[in-house]
Amino acid sequence: MADNKPELQRGLEARHIELIALGGTIGVGLFMGAASTLKWAGPSVLLAYIIAGLFVFFIMRSMGEMLFLEPVTGSFAVYAHRYMSPFFGYLTAWSYWFMWMAVGISEITAIGVYVQFWFPEMAQWIPALIAVALVALANLAAVRLYGEIEFWFAMIKVTTIIVMIVIGLGVIFFGFGNGGQSIGFSNLTEHGGFFAGGWKGFLTALCIVVASYQGVELIGITAGEAKNPQVTLRSAVGKVLWRILIFYVGAIFVIVTIFPWNEIGSNGSPFVLTFAKIGITAAAGIINFVVLTAALSGCNSGMYSCGRMLYALAKNRQLPAAMAKVSRHGVPVAGVAVSIAILLIGSCLNYIIPNPQRVFVYVYSASVLPGMVPWFVILISQLRFRRAHKAAIASHPFRSILFPWANYVTMAFLICVLIGMYFNEDTRMSLFVGIIFMLAVTAIYKVFGLNRHGKAHKLEE
């Protein structure tokens, strides 16, 4: 008898996938957190974004090579299951789920703060609760509708960044808003020099900058729902990282060139100041709206990922089969519902803890180490993937470059970043939280004998 159970649907086009990845990566960290890294490194933070982007490029090309031959939902978690061991597939899926849950809770916390800009008397838990409801509705819709919602969410902040870069270049080269006098590049070398924070400040900022790229691998999560995945995913992998790199580096370049780096953050958001520079008096309200949608977009992308990770775990028999339930619209409804429920519980922190900054910092920082696990897994899995696909690799149109040396050097770089996090007081606790979480899920794996549950399944053809 044929199995007519609903399955995930391939309803995502290239533009949806690209904007889902952009939406998940470019979050409130760029709009609100630029001042932190500049405080440590000064203008050299530009170099930190470029270096981190280079290594993330190698990671993405490795993932793209595997996605072309095996476009499955769960992506790197499934590859870990197949090419490393069921345990690493399990650990990867839970680590990525935990990362996005932490990011999601921090994003809805931020939403409460942004709404108070217009309604200062409103309790922050109210807009946080409304945000959870909106994200739930978007993620329980058919995947194509979800893709459209996230496309427009992400488009708002992408457009804002582009406009900000264009305005900034006008100020730098043509003196817009500066009496016609071009500002030039003096702010990059004055006020302590390009490496104003020294090498220690640069390396400290580099650790945080690496974390800002987390989310770019969301492309892999969409693989099982992409139309014509070989073409769509190849295009998305090739475009997304370059766009993110341009947006990050372009925005930071404009900010540190227009304003002295040691004044950024003391007079408000650098994005607000850039728009205000050319006389846009409503700049604060505009940017507040943009960061509000940025937070919604980041949370929306995160819940999409969380639902698919729980689905992948259930398919690999590492969660109850009920978690693999798919609605008639092709949505992994059980995984999404559980993730939304925990997000709802997390939103209660906004009621319990009145200081939103404490909630945001504690929760967001806890996501960094679990978010790096998929990167290590992608690089290691590809080493074994190559051996399993020798014949196909010879004619592969999207092979990664500098293999295998790029894999080894990138892993060494990520290890150095983790070591740097330990020696930085601002990030040490987040490292410990990540380690505790990974030890906890490992203990559950052993205690419940999840290693006895079958071998990997091919989720999607």
Curated annotation (Swiss-Prot):
UniProtKB keywords: Amino-acid transport, Cell inner membrane, Cell membrane, Membrane, Transmembrane, Transmembrane helix, Transport
One of the GO BP terms on file: L-serine transport
Regulation: Activity is inhibited by CCCP, a proton gradient uncoupler, but is insensitive to monensin.
Residues passing through the membrane, by range: 17-37, 40-60, 97-117, 123-143, 156-176, 201-221, 244-264, 278-298, 333-353, 360-380, 401-421, 430-450
Family statement: Belongs to the amino acid-polyamine-organocation (APC) superfamily.
Organism of provenance: Escherichia coli (strain K12)
Reaction(s) catalysed (UniProt annotation): L-threonine(in) + H(+)(in) = L-threonine(out) + H(+)(out); L-serine(in) + H(+)(in) = L-serine(out) + H(+)(out)
GO MF annotations, alphabetized: L-serine transmembrane transporter activity; L-threonine transmembrane transporter activity
Cytoplasmic side: 1-16, 61-96, 144-155, 222-243, 299-332, 381-400, 451-461
Entry keyword annotation includes Membrane: yes
Record-given protein name: Threonine/serine transporter ThrP
Function noted in UniProt: Permease that mediates the proton-dependent threonine and serine uptake. Shows higher specificity for threonine. Cannot transport homoserine.
Gene: thrP
Lineage of the species this protein comes from: Bacteria, Pseudomonadati, Pseudomonadota, Gammaproteobacteria, Enterobacterales
